[in-house]
């Protein structure tokens, strides 16, 4: 920190400058390079930088007439040594630095670069904290760990794991990388359960590594992300192999430190390769190209078989080329190489032995920085271009799997398409690639040489029991109840489901049930669930409804019972009455139907009147025909034939309408007559809200808060009820006697209540949809495993058998309170019989009136003669009249048709008779005139 404050102090000494300027384009441009010569990355970078300088100097299109001169310094990843070497560079008038390699060095010399305006092009610093706002002259030519940690989080999320353990080197590189991992996991609702930091020099301390791994073994997660340096990483894997942590059940994800070693030392020594079997590794992705393949051929000639090329060697090469192209643009824009000194630094240098007067400021540093950032080129690592935040565009990683004597490519990750088995450069050509149909990763050979995906979590074998909260209910004990005489033993439907699910888990889960409640009234389930967040409970088992406010603080298993709020109210039967046959249609329907019958009859009469004799005749007859035809179509019994085309068309359509009306009427009437109708003044939750009647709810249920907060029902209307007996009494008394109009409760409780109380029923629909589940802390893997077990219970029928054991009641089921079939009684039909009887009596009455009129209107001649011959005895007259009445009733009456025909025939006979009479008279007159004849 003292060195940092020194450089901050120097930044204020910016007066009294004098300048050393090269007025012409220099023949040699000096650049520096700082990295660790002995590291895997440094060994490759040294060769790559030398080759890049050679290519720049031999290319006439870059810096024509100017040569690169590079000076390399070994920082050994030491902050102090890095600062010293950087100070030495500042004495040599360099215009740019390739490096540094390590985060600790980058943090130190970036402050110096800011003050002296010398761009730093780092090919290996992945620390995401290196911000361009804080370090404007720091340019990262590699990929940031921000993207690498995003890729790891995507892998963890893809396989459905929830918790990971992070092993990291305890310096800027490790801490900042793990912080980025934590953020990326948190954005996916995942988390780091345990962070194990190791000192960079811990590789030689076997005991410290062993103690750290033993702590990890006692934890539940089995996903380990290791973000360290090479030697430390291999030491961790060696001890993990010894402890059996490289076998079944574990998942190890290594950052790019391992892929760098795999690429540079291919193949790894057998003893090291054996310790990393099944590990997933990330490697910065570089697209394939002819330029890259040609460089690999050159590399084999340069290094032989002693050192293989890794990704960071490619980044080092591209860093030199980027600086060269930036300088080329700088010169073409008229830039000059010039340096300035501070007069104050000269004074300080003369007064001491620090030689500060030799430190110079690069006057063209800001212009060169802009030219570098504005350069676009295609190098060994693909397209080299920067985003506004100084990150490389199109970041991508290879995901490889160590198996056997080598590695397997199982997929890729990019910030454009996420996980995929398709090359990222192909997906970048699509605006929004659809990855739903393609596999995201290939099959992995996991530790233990298995293709089965590890669960990623085990129940910790540390001898501790899970503290499971159980509600101490005072009602509906079929669901959960404490066994009398015990403290931590419970029974009931919920307990049996939980026990059966736990027995299906592939690992043992020791639990201890802890009662919650005072035993006098049902406890608050929301408060009980909140105790999970405070650590009082490790879980809650019981009839706990899955509702929104609870899911925000805990995780629930798959619902093992359907639940939702319903309204229970008293009901009464509505029997079908004498006028039930009128109920299928309302008044308007009856009126419209009758009018339609008349209208169709009139229309058909109009269409048939001129052509059809059956629709002709006197007005009275035609009116009767219209009425008869209209209403006889109701039964398809009309006798009049239609002869016109239009008449037939209208009749066909009308008969189809009549068919539909008859069918609907018959179906509705059948339902009314054969099904009992149940009635309640409350039709559902909406009608209950509109009334001012009191509403009952179960103590401890979430129904109270739902009614108050969601439905805005006044608290004064809510009546707490504790037992089924209290339910029945409150409903029976009703609002007038201090009871309730209805009760709102969850369906399982209601079904159990109605199984023994048939005077009540559910009215309306279930107005919330939820279920019962077991509650555990957020992101608990146990909730996931138990959900799978509950689904298995449902599939094999065990869940239904447990339900039938505790909740199946035979005394009075809910169906008895629903609509049911019954026999038909006379009271349902006496109205029809009455109408029919009245019609019959009325017809008889009119008929007898007509007979009597005929009896007195047209007496026969024989009857008159007999009346004259007999005495006037009253009894004889009554007998005679009765005989005449009976004789008249028995006499056949001419039909109107026959009467009309008879009249016509009589008229014709009269006409012919008069003609014959007139002829006879003429003949007689003729004979009298001619007597001789």
Curated annotation (Swiss-Prot):
Keyword Membrane listed: yes
Gene deletion effect: Impaired glutamate-triggered (and Ala, Asn, Cys, Gly, Ser and glutathione-triggered) membrane depolarization and calcium rise. Reduced wound-activated surface potential changes (WASP) duration in the wounded leaf, resulting in a decreased induction of the regulators of jasmonate-signaling in the systemic leaves. Glr3.3 and glr3.6 double mutant has no detectable changes in surface potential in systemic leaves and the induction of the regulators of jasmonate-signaling is more strongly decreased.
Glycan attachment positions: 76, 336, 341, 415, 434, 549, 712
InterPro entries xrefs: ANF_lig-bd_rcpt (IPR001828), GABAb_receptor_plant_PBP1 (IPR044440), Ionotropic_Glu_rcpt (IPR015683), Iontro_rcpt_C (IPR001320), Iontropic_Glu_rcpt_pln (IPR017103), Peripla_BP_I (IPR028082), Solute-binding_3/MltF_N (IPR001638)
Domain of life of the organism encoding this protein: Eukaryota
Gene Ontology MF term list: calcium channel activity; glutamate receptor activity; ligand-gated monoatomic ion channel activity
Bilayer-crossing regions: 588-608, 617-637, 649-669, 829-849
Binding sites annotated in the UniProt record for L-methionine: 543-545, 550, 702, 746-749
Positions that bind L-cysteine: 543-545, 550, 702, 746-749
Entry keyword set: Cell membrane, Disulfide bond, Glycoprotein, Ion channel, Ion transport, Ligand-gated ion channel, Membrane, Receptor, Signal, Transmembrane, Transmembrane helix, Transport
Gene Ontology CC entries for this record: plasma membrane
Tissues in which the protein is found: Expressed predominantly in roots and siliques.
Subunit structure of this chain's protein: May form heteromers.
Function of the molecule: Glutamate-gated receptor that probably acts as a non-selective cation channel, at least in roots and hypocotyls. Can be triggered by Ala, Asn, Cys, Glu, Gly, Ser and glutathione (a tripeptide consisting of Glu-Gly-Cys). Mediates leaf-to-leaf wound signaling. May be involved in light-signal transduction and calcium homeostasis via the regulation of calcium influx into cells. Contributes to pathogen-associated molecular patterns (PAMP) elicitor-mediated resistance.
Name under which the protein is recorded: Glutamate receptor 3.3
Organism (species): Arabidopsis thaliana (Mouse-ear cress)
Lineage, highest ranks first: Eukaryota, Viridiplantae, Streptophyta, Embryophyta, Tracheophyta
């Amino acid at each position: 920190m003292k060195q940092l404050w020194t450089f901050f102090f120097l930044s204020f000494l910016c007066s009294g400058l004098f300048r050393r300027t090269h007025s012409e384009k220099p023949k040699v441009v000096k650049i520096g390079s700082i990295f660790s010569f002995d590291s895997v990355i440094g060994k490759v970078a040294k060769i790559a930088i030398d080759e890049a300088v050679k290519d720049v100097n031999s290319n006439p299109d870059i810096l024509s007439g100017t040569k690169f001169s590079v000076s390399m310094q070994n920082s050994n990843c030491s902050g102090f040594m890095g600062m010293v070497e950087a100070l030495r560079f500042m004495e040599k008038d360099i215009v740019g630095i390739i490096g540094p390699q390590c985060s600790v060095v980058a943090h130190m010399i970036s402050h110096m670069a800011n003050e002296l305006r010398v761009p730093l092009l780092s090919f290996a610093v992945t620390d995401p904290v290196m911000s361009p706002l804080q370090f404007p002259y720091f340019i990262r030519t590699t990929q940031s760990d921000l993207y690498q940690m995003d890729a790891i989080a995507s892998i963890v999320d893809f396989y459905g794991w929830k918790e990971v353990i992070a092993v990291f080197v305890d310096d800027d590189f490790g801490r900042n990388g793990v912080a980025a991992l934590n953020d990326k996991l948190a954005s996916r609702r995942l988390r780091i359960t345990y962070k194990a930091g190791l000192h960079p020099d811990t590789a030689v301390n076997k005991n410290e590594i062993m103690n750290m791994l033993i702590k990890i073994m006692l934890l539940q997660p089995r996903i380990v992300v290791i973000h360290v340096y090479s030697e430390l990483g291999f030491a961790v894997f060696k001890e993990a192999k010894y402890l059996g942590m490289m076998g079944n059940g574990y998942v190890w994800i290594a950052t790019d430190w391992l892929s760098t070693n795999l690429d540079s030392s291919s193949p790894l020594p057998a003893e090291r390769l054996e310790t990393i079997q099944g590990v997933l590794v990330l490697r910065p992705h570089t697209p394939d190209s002819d330029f890259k393949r040609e460089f690999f051929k050159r590399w084999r000639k340069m290094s032989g078989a002693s050192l293989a090329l890794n990704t960071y060697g490619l980044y080092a090469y591209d860093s030199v080329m980027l600086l060269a192209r930036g300088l080329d643009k700088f010169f073409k824009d008229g830039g000059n190489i010039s340096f300035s000194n501070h007069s104050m630094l000269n004074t300080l240098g003369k007064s001491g032995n620090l030689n500060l007067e030799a430190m110079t400021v690069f006057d063209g540093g800001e212009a060169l920085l802009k030219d570098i950032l504005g350069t676009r080129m295609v190098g060994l690592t693909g397209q080299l271009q920067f985003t506004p935040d100084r990150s490389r565009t199109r970041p991508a990683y290879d995901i490889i799997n160590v198996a056997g004597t080598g590695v397997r490519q199982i997929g890729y990750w990019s910030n454009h398409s996420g996980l995929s088995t398709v090359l990222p450069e192909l997906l970048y050509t699509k605006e929004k690639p659809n990855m739903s149909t393609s596999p995201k990763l290939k099959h992995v050979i996991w530790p233990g040489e298995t293709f089965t995906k590890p669960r990623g979590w085990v129940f910790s074998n540390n001898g501790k029991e899970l503290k499971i909260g159980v509600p101490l209910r005072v009602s509906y004990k079929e669901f959960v109840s404490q066994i009398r005489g015990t403290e931590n033993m419970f029974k009931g439907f919920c307990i049996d489901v939980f026990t059966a699910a736990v027995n299906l888990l592939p690992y043992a889960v020791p639990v201890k049930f802890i009662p919650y409640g005072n035993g006098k009234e049902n406890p608050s389930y929301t408060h009980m669930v909140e105790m999970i967040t405070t650590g009082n409970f490790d879980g809650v088992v019981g009839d706990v409804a899955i509702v929104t406010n609870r899911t925000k603080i805990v995780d629930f298993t798959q619902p093992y019972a359907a639940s939702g709020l319903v309204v229970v109210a008293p009901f009464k039967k509505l029997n079908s009455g004498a006028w039930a046959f009128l109920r299928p249609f309302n008044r308007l329907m009856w009126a419209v139907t009758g009018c339609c019958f008349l209208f169709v009859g009139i229309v058909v009469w109009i269409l048939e009147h001129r052509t059809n004799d059956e629709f002709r005749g006197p007005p009275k007859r035609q009116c009767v025909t219209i009425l008869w035809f209209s209403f006889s179509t109701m039964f398809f019994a009309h006798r009049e034939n239609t002869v016109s085309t239009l008449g037939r068309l209208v009749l066909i359509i009308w008969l189809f309408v009549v068919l539909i009306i008859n069918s609907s009427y018959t179906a509705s009437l059948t339902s009314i007559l054969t099904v009992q109708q149940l009635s309640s003044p409350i039709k559902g939750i909406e009608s209950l809200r509109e009334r001012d009647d009191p509403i009952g709810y179960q103590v401890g249920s979430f129904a109270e808060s739902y009614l108050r907060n969601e439905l805005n029902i006044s608290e004064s209307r809510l009546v707490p009820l504790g037992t089924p007996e209290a339910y029945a009494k409150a409903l029976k008394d009703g609002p007038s006697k201090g009871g309730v109009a209805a009760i709102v409760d969850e369906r399982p409780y209601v079904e159990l209540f109605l199984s023994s109380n048939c005077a009540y029923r559910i009215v309306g629909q279930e107005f919330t949809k939820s279920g019962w589940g077991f509650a555990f802390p957020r992101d608990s893997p146990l909730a996931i495993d138990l959900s799978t077990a509950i689904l298995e219970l449902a599939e094999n029928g065990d869940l239904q058998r447990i339900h039938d054991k505790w909740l199946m009641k035979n005394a009075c089921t809910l169906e008895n309170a629903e609509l049911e079939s019954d026999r038909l009684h006379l009271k349902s039909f006496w109205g029809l019989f009455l109408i029919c009887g009245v019609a019959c009596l009325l017809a008889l009455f009119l008929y007898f009136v007509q007979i009597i009129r005929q009896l007195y209107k047209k007496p026969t001649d024989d009857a008159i003669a007999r009346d004259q011959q007999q005495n006037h005895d009253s009894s004889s007259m009554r007998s005679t009249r009765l005989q005449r009445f009976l004789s008249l009733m028995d006499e056949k009456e001419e039909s109107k048709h026959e009467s009309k025909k008879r009249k016509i025939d009589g008229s014709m006979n009269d006409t012919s008779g008069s003609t014959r009479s007139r002829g006879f008279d003429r003949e007689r007159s003729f004979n009298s005139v001619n007597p001789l004849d």
